């Protein structure tokens, strides 16, 4: 795996509050290697460790993006929903930013069926067929389409399982993480001081509740994906 310079600035991470962990009583002892100190009953994350992990993750994403691989970004907690959609759209990644539907990956055949239903309903709407139906039936189909758009809109173009998943909150996305582990899909995950870093392939110690923190980490990761793809197209 190639190593590059990703302009990861410790002061910028401080300003984004990446270093702020949870209350000390909530900690997971496995996060001890990533904790710098505690202040007012709050654990402070070692940003040097964060920078090292983030750089490693960026190197990996750059390399596999250059090989045309596919990415899935997952973040359904309210702080992350808009950030995930924006970052994933800009980097042309698949994403889930609403409720994770159990079996979305492990029961991929069912997900494919739902995606096909979504595409069929979208086509019917776009061609004006809804307008030709009785109002009650059209309203029912519109509700179905809205639900599918809400939960599957971010993966509507996903035709196979992703090659790697980026997860913004380990505890909130435990089902998604579990499915990735079951299927052997590599994971990059923000891990706060109450998380278990052993559950992911590349843990990035960081505040997983703060909007600025999530945004900074996501921006660095998706920039690496974009750079890898740009190099591939040369």
Curated annotation (Swiss-Prot):
Protein name as annotated: Small ribosomal subunit protein uS2c
Gene3D superfamilies: Glucose-6-phosphate isomerase like protein, domain 1, Helix hairpin bin
SUPFAM superfamilies for the chain: Ribosomal protein S2
Pfam families named among the record's database cross-references: Ribosomal_S2 (PF00318)
Keyword Chloroplast attached: yes
GO biological process: translation
Similarity section: Belongs to the universal ribosomal protein uS2 family.
GO molecular function term, any single one: structural constituent of ribosome
Any one GO CC term of the record: mitochondrial small ribosomal subunit
Keyword Ribosomal protein attributed: yes
Coiled coil: none
NCBIfam families given in the database record: rpsB_bact (TIGR01011)
Subcellular location: Plastid, Chloroplast
Taxonomic source organism: Pinus thunbergii (Japanese black pine)
Lineage: Eukaryota, Viridiplantae, Streptophyta, Embryophyta, Tracheophyta
Superkingdom classification of source: Eukaryota
Entry keywords, A to Z: Chloroplast, Plastid, Ribonucleoprotein, Ribosomal protein
HAMAP family per record: Ribosomal_uS2_B
């Amino acid at each position: 795996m190639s190593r590059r310079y990703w302009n990861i600035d410790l002061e910028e991470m401080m300003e984004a509050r990446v270093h702020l962990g949870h209350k000390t009583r909530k900690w997971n002892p496995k996060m001890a290697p990533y904790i710098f100190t505690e202040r007012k009953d709050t654990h402070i994350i070692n940003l040097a460790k964060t920078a090292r992990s983030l750089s490693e993750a960026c190197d990996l994403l750059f390399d596999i993006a250059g090989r045309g691989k596919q990415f899935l970004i997952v973040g359904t907690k309210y702080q992350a929903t808009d950030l995930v959609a924006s970052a994933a759209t800009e980097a042309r990644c698949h994403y889930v930013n609403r409720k994770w539907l159990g079996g979305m990956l492990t029961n991929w055949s069912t997900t494919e069926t739902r995606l096909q239903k979504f595409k069929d309903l979208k086509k019917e709407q776009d061609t004006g067929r809804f307008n030709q139906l009785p109002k009650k039936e059209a309203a029912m189909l519109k509700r179905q389409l809205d639900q599918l758009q809400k939960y599957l809109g971010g993966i509507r173009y996903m035709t196979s399982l992703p090659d790697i998943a980026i997860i913004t909150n380990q505890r909130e996305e435990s089902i998604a993480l579990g499915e990735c582990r079951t299927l052997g899909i590599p994971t990059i995950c923000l891990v706060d001081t109450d998380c278990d870093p052993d559950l992911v392939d590349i843990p990035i110690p960081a505040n997983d509740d703060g909007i600025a923190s999530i945004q900074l980490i996501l921006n660095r990761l998706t920039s690496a994906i974009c750079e890898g793809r740009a190099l591939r197209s040369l």
